[in-house]
Amino acid sequence: MRRSVLVRNPGHKGLRPVYEELDSDSEDLDPNPEDLDPVSEDPEPDPEDLNTVPEDVDPSYEDLEPVSEDLDPDAEAPGSEPQDPDPMSSSFDLDPDVIGPVPLILDPNSDTLSPGDPKVDPISSGLTATPQVLATSPAVLPAPASPPRPFSCPDCGRAFRRSSGLSQHRRTHSGEKPYRCPDCGKSFSHGATLAQHRGIHTGARPYQCAACGKAFGWRSTLLKHRSSHSGEKPHHCPVCGKAFGHGSLLAQHLRTHGGPRPHKCPVCAKGFGQGSALLKHLRTHTGERPYPCPQCGKAFGQSSALLQHQRTHTAERPYRCPHCGKAFGQSSNLQHHLRIHTGERPYACPHCSKAFGQSSALLQHLHVHSGERPYRCQLCGKAFGQASSLTKHKRVHEGAAAAAAAAAAAAAAAAAGLGLGPGLSPASMMRPGQVSLLGPDAVSVLGSGLGLSPGTSSGRNPDPGSGPGTLPDPSSKPLPGSRSTPSPTPVESSDPKAGHDAGPDLVPSPDLDPVPSPDPDPVPSPDPNPVSCPDPCSPTRGTVSPALPTGESPEWVQEQGALLGPDG
C-alpha cells in the first residue's frame, strides 16, 4: 500500500508529497479511510506554502488524499498566526521551480487566501479580489467650468465674455462698418478683417501650407486648402452626390441646386448665394478693377482672374487631363475638357432635346429659338446669332479686300510700265462723277488710247499757267486725211478759273460761232502738224507717237470698252 505525506523540500519553501510503500497492516493508518479528514482545519498553513505547485507529481496520483497526521516536523505549528497577504502584491508567484501560476482568491468571509478554481482568469480575479485597491485609486476630476459670459446680445441672445466682443457682434445686426480700406474704399466691421483684406492689395500671404508651400491671405482659405492634400471629403451633396472637404463648401454648392439667393444686386436685381459673389458682380457695373498685373499692368476685377492671367506670362499649366495628358491653366477648362471623354452634357435646352457640355454653348443655341442676333459685323452691319457664324462671315470681307489689293497692285504695275511721269495722276484724267472699275490707277492707261505713246506726253499744254496734268481736247487733234478746222470756243465750266482746269470740263459747242475769247490767255490752236515734245524722263525719248486711222482705237480700248464706258 502506498501513502503520501507532505514534507518540506530543502531549499524550497513549499511542501511536497512523498510516497512510501506501506504494509497493509500498518498501525499508522486508520483502518477506516472514510474517517480521514482531507485537509486539517486546525492548522492554518502559510500562504506562501500554498502558493506553489509540485513539479514532480505524477498525474495519476493527483486524486490522492494527503494525510495530515504525518506532517513534517519542520511544518508550522497549528497555532501559528498566518501572515496577512499584501493587497498590492501579485495574486500568483512566478517561481522558476514552479510549473505554472496558481490563482488565489480572497475569500470575502475570511482573511486567508485559498486555492481557487484554475479556470478563473488570474487578472480578473486579482482585480475583483482587492477592493482596497479600487478604493485607493485617484478619483476622476470633473471638467472645469467654462468662464462666465455675462454680456448677451439683445437681438439674438448670443453671450460674450467681454463687452468688446459684444460691441463687434452687434455690428452684424446694425450693418455698421467703420473700418474702410484706403486702397479700394471697401468697409469692414472688424479691424482684423480689414487687415486681412489689405493683404490683397499688398500681396501679403501670411498663411502658408506646410505640405506644398502655397500661401494664402486668409486662414480660412488655408484650412480649406489642406483638405486637398488629405483627400478627405466627408460632406456629400444630397442632390448630386458631390463631396466636399468642408461644410461651408457644401452649403455654397447647395445653392446651385436652387437654394436661396438672398444677396440681390441693386443694379440688375440678380441674386447670389454669397455676399462675396455679389461684391464681385458689382464690379461689372462699376468697372472697378483693383487687381493689376505686375508684368503687363492689365487690371482685373477678381483676384482669381489675375492669378489665371499671370499663367499666360509664366506658361504654367498645372491642370492636366488624366485621359489624354492635355494641360490647362484653369481648372474650369479642364472640367469642360473632361466632358469630351466622359460624354457628359449637363446643359439641356428647355425648348428642344438638345444638350451641351458647356453653358456658353447652350446660350448660343438659345438664340436659335429666340431669334436674337447679338453678333454684328462692323464692316457691313450684318448680324448673326452665333459668334462662329460671324467669324465665318468676316472671311468674305477678308477675301474681297485681298482681291482689291491684288487688283490695285496690278494696276499700279501697269501704270508704272506706261511711264506717265510724276505730273500725271489717274484722278486728273477722270471726269467729275466718273468711276472706273479697274482701280484708281487704271485710268492712267487711258492716256495711251488718246494717241499717247508710252513714255511721252503728246500735246501737253505748254502754257505754264495750265496744270501739269492737263491734256488737250481729243477733238482738236486732226487725224490724217481730215481738214483742219478752227478751234471752237470753249464753254466755261463751273470752275471760276476757266482755262486753268484739267480740261475735261471744257466741252466744244458746235452751235455757236467762233468768237474771240475774252480770256487774256486763250488756248492756242493746235499745230496742223503736231510734233511730239520729247519727255526728258521717258526712256523712248525722241520717238513720235503713231497716229490712229479714222474711227479706229487700240485693241485694249475695244476690249475694255465695257468697263470704261462710252466716254472712255
Curated annotation (Swiss-Prot):
Annotated Pro residues bias = 511-537
Q: What does this protein do?
A: May be involved in transcriptional regulation.
Q: What are the protein's GO molecular function terms?
A: DNA-binding transcription factor activity; RNA polymerase II cis-regulatory region sequence-specific DNA binding; zinc ion binding
Q: Which GO terms describe its cellular component?
A: nucleus
Q: What GO biological process term is on the record, naming one? A: regulation of transcription by RNA polymerase II
Q: Which UniProt keywords apply?
A: DNA-binding, Metal-binding, Nucleus, Repeat, Transcription, Transcription regulation, Zinc, Zinc-finger
Q: Which domain of life is it from?
A: Eukaryota
**Where are the compositionally biased (Polar residues) regions?**
482-492
User: Is Mitochondrion there in the keyword field?
Assistant: no
Q: Which residues form a coiled coil?
A: none
Pfam families reported for this sequence: zf-C2H2
What is the designated name of this protein?
Zinc finger protein 358
Record's compositionally biased regions (Basic and acidic residues)? 494-503
